[in-house]
Every structure is written in structure tokens, then in C-alpha cells.
């Protein structure tokens, strides 16, 4: 039995479809809460999608804007739910998506770090253990004691990245987050992801337009177009398929 076969499945999509109702305007959307007669159009963001990710794998979701990549990530993280089909996820997820979202602007950087770690299910003891790593990685100095309303958008993103990569995830989801901050900080981010992926028990789901980066971190790729899977296989073959589209 191969190593891949022995490792357990940590993410499974089983014939998953996701549709959104598009209304003419906000007024129509509000009326739809009280009446089923309001007209709308259905937009299918993900179409009958099936795939599995095993523990320790690195998988790249490849596709142009509108391919359904962000919708897939939202369903994995529980932000959104499928219209039909089943999704199975096993493990603590750290998602490098909207890095500066979910912060309390009136609380300090340190307070926000503790709060976001607690939302990830970490105990107080675990939080205090990783807090020095978050502080060192964010490299925000005295600003960590200041309320986030004093932060620039880049500083918030740095803090968000520092929290996510130091929270000891089972599953790491990266969506263009490696473009955070200046050149030196971006190099620091890439190095940190390399360190995380050196742990064969961490699973990576990677969404990027930088295919060379995907090639470095991932073994397999899934090519998507308008919510439909066109190809799944070895990362080199997936990139070649995408380039030929």
C-alpha cells in the first residue's frame, strides 16, 4: 500500500454544487425574505464537484477569475454551504484568505491575536505558547499594544498572516496571501509556508495565479473553469493543461 493510500482523507467534496440567487437590486433581495414571488436569476458557482485531499498533501486550485476557487474555499471553511452534495473536513483550519477581516478595531494587536486564536479553538495555554511567535513574525513593534484603528491595511494583513501561520493548523488554506506587505515580508511569508509544509502532517490547499509558487508547494493540481473541474492530476500536468486552455 502506498503512502498516499495510507494517509487519511481530510477534505472530501462529493458531487458538490453551489448556486446563488441574483436579485435585481437590494430592495428585491429584501422583499425575497418575505415573499417567494420575487424574481431572481440562479448563478451556479460550483458544478457537481468531487475531489479528495489526503493528510499532508499540497493541492493547488487553478483557474481564472470566476472559476469557483473562492467559493470552494468558503465552503471548506464553513463561511458558505453547498446547495447540494456533501463536504467532509477533518482538522483545524487556518485560512489565509481575507487576512484583515474579523478584527476588533478598538482592541490592540495583542488582544486581537488572542481573540482570533481562541476562535480557532485554541486553549489559553496554547495561545500563550504561540503568542511570542506571532509577535516576532508580525514585527509590528509598539503598534501591537495600539488599537487596530491606528493600523494601515498592510499592518492588519501582516498581523492576520502572523496569527494564521503560527496557530498550528492541520489544514492551511492560502489564497493569494503570499503577496502581503513589502518584498522582505513576502519572502518571510514564503519561507514560513515552506517550514509548515515540511511537517508532513499539514495539508495545504493553495489558490494562486503564480503557478511557479504552486509548483513549489503542491504535488497535485485541480483545474477549474466556471465551477466545473476540467482536470485533476500531477501539478506539472495540471499547469501544462491550464496553460494550453
Regions found by a protein language model. Give the residues of each.
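Pre-NBD coupling/linker segments of ABC/ABC-like ATPases
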Residues: 1-45, 238-244
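Conserved ABC ATPase "signature" region
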Residues: 31-32, 114, 126-143
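The feature captures the beta-strand-to-loop junction immediately N-terminal to the Walker
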Residues: 62-64
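Helix-to-loop junction immediately C-terminal to a conserved catalytic motif
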Residues: 77
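H-loop/switch region of ABC-family ATPase nucleotide-binding domains
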Residues: 208-209
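H-loop (His-switch) and adjacent beta-strand-loop-beta switch element
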Residues: 217-234, 242
Amino acid at each position: 500500500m502506498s503512502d498516499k493510500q495510507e494517509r487519511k482523507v481530510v477534505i472530501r467534496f462529493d458531487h458538490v454544487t453551489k448556486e446563488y440567487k441574483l436579485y435585481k437590486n437590494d430592495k428585491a433581495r429584501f422583499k425575497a425574505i418575505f415573499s417567494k414571488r420575487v424574481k431572481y436569476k440562479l448563478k451556479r458557482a460550483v458544478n457537481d464537484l468531487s475531489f479528495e485531499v489526503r493528510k499532508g498533501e499540497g493541492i493547488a486550485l487553478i483557474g481564472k477569475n470566476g472559476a469557483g476557487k473562492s467559493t470552494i474555499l468558503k465552503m471548506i471553511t464553513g463561511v458558505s454551504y453547498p446547495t447540494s452534495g456533501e463536504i467532509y473536513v477533518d482538522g483545524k483550519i487556518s485560512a489565509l484568505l481575507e487576512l484583515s477581516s474579523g478584527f476588533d478595531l478598538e482592541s490592540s494587536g495583542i488582544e486581537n491575536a488572542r481573540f482570533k486564536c481562541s476562535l480557532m479553538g485554541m486553549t489559553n495555554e496554547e495561545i500563550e505558547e504561540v503568542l511570542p511567535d506571532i509577535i516576532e513574525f508580525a514585527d509590528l513593534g509598539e503598534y501591537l499594544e495600539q488599537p487596530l484603528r491606528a493600523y494601515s491595511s498592510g499592518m492588519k494583513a501582516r498581523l492576520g498572516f502572523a496569527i494564521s501561520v503560527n496557530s498550528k493548523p492541520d489544514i492551511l488554506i492560502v489564497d493569494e496571501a503570499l503577496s502581503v506587505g513589502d518584498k522582505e515580508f513576502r519572502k518571510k511569508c514564503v519561507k514560513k509556508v515552506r517550514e509548515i509544509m515540511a511537517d508532513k502532517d499539514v495539508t495545504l490547499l493553495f489558490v494562486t495565479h503564480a503557478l511557479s509558487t504552486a509548483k513549489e508547494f503542491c504535488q497535485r493540481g485541480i483545474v477549474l473553469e466556471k465551477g466545473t473541474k476540467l482536470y485533476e492530476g500531477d501539478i506539472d500536468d495540471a499547469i501544462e493543461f491550464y496553460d494550453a486552455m
